[in-house]
Amino acid sequence: MSMTLHFALDPELTPELRAEIVTLWTDATNAGGAVGFVPPATEDRVWPTARKQFAGIGKEGDPGADRLLIARSGDVLAGVLFFESMRFDLMDHWRLLKRVMVAPSLQGRGYGVELMAEAERIGRDWGLAGLRLTARGGMGLEKFYGRCGYTEVGRVPGAIRVAPGDERDDITFWRDLRPQA
């Protein structure tokens, strides 16, 4: 039986939480997750990218700022994702989900689906028209995101080079949040 997830939108980004996120990010990468790096990854390698991601986070009501959603199972950081703003008025009606991660030790419990459902609930509460995300091809993520209600809307062949001679498609998914008539 799995523990209930508890979500927090815009938690205080303390040094401790930053470190927890970097540890989760490193662990997710080393478990084969496609979150910006390839294994073997170290926290020292992840920190510079994490600092840039953290720098975009604003406070509630801060227009154009990125937002952070975390999930905890008890005291353990179970999942993370970022709502990234395009910082462009003509695209302010949707957000890009970035760094969607679940702790490898907690995978297989439905936490990824719960994290995506909470992101959708928040997006609807904000009145967004949709949520977009990108994924690395060759990882089997199409099936997971399809179960979460996302539709593949584009693919750039070979756009992600994970190693010399190993290029993967950059896949774009969309979750339409507009009310259906």
Q: Locations of the language-model features?
A:
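Terminal substrate-recognition subdomain of acyl/acetyltransferases
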Residues: 2-3, 10-13, 151, 162-181
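Acetyl-CoA-dependent GNAT
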Residues: 7-99, 103, 116-118, 122, ...
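Active-site-proximal loop/turn and secondary-structure-junction residues that shape catalytic pockets
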Residues: 101, 137-139
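Active-site acidic-Proline motif in GNAT/NAT acetyltransferases
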Residues: 103-109
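Residues forming the Rossmann-fold NAD(P)(H) cofactor-binding site
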Residues: 113
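Conserved GNAT acetyl-CoA-binding A-motif
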Residues: 116, 123-136
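Conserved catalytic-core motifs of GNAT/GCN5-like acyltransferases
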Residues: 132-136, 146, 151-169
